[in-house]
Amino acid sequence: MESGRVAYSPKAAARFYVPLLLQAFSQSLTYPLVGAVISHGPDGVNALTAFSLGQVIQFMIGALAGGLIMTGMVFAKTRSGLSSFRRLNGVMMAVLLAVQALVCMHPFDTFIFGHLLNLNPHLTEIARRTLFFSIVMQAAFFMRNVPQVILFNAYASFEANLCTVARILLTGAFVVAFPMFGMVGPDWGLVALTAPIILEWLLSELFARKYERRLEDGGSASIMEQFRFTVPLSFGAGLLAVSPFMTAAFVGRAANPADMLAIHYVTLGIANPVAYAALRMQAVAIQFPPEWTGDRRLLRFAVVAGLLLGVIPFLFSLPRGKELENN
């Protein structure tokens, strides 16, 4: 067994998976929560629709680097490996932030939001502003990658969980406090999402320092090798991010498109956390490879986890669950 690697057991796998699970849930569930801040603004639910579409484009762009965390979990286990991973993360961040800024410019913004998604000019502007100022959020996600990889590789589940819980709690506090002080609308909604992510990144950096100092020297793959490893891992996240955009292009042409899109994104707020959580099983498979030919213990763990995750959308499809979702 590789030095420093934890042997597989259901408890070890669950302990490793829970921070990934919590992060996936927080990354998706916090967005519907912030809908309360946005929809209480002057444009009501229409602003929530435009805001959500701006976020969808952001996630599509970010998904092009969706495999970075897993790449770091494979290659960033030595000082030199972490250094190469940090450079790769920085390069991909710079390129994708530039792409995000470019998409906000004319004529791309009008083509995407006006032509493809069928938004009127006012809602197109809200979506464009959301996408543009989400560059800060996107940068925070990338900056978080490096310390999160260090924590995951060190099996520091407590610290990783603490960072994510702090993000959820701060988001919840904003959702309650902002409307009380009249701080509503898309711009304040974006603040309510972005500031907690920055907090999560800063806490991750703080907790990761002691584990980074413990890394040993050793060989490392080049940036290009790590990039080639990242691309196929990003494919699943990319498909997951593209599907809401494709669906929105059809929903936006239905009767009462703004209302229909708002319902669409509330529903995605339930489905997406489950999908992202299931996708994180890739990281568990990387961290706990088979220890002998025919070792299927992780397969059984994945099946049980998948069944438990599937219960969540099922419960919301029941009459009582529908009432809760509507409320």
Roles of regions detected by a PLM:
Residues 1-18, 125-126, 186-194, 199-241:
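Interhelical loop/hinge segments that connect adjacent transmembrane helices in multipass membrane
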Residues 12, 16, 35-59, 122-126, ...:
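Interfacial/gating helices of multi-pass transporter permease domains
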Residues 16-24, 59, 134, 160, ...:
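Residue-level signature of transmembrane alpha-helical cores of multipass secondary-active transporters
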Residues 48-100, 144-153, 261-311:
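Small-residue-rich hydrophobic transmembrane alpha-helices
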Residues 66-73, 133-152, 163-168, 189-205, ...:
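Short runs within selected transmembrane alpha-helices of multi-pass transporters and secretion channels
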Residues 98-128, 309-327:
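Short membrane-interface helical motifs at transmembrane helix boundaries
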Residues 121-147, 270, 274, 327:
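Alpha-helical transmembrane segments of multi-pass membrane proteins
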Residues 168-201, 316-327:
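Membrane-interface helix-loop junctions in multi-pass transport and translocation proteins
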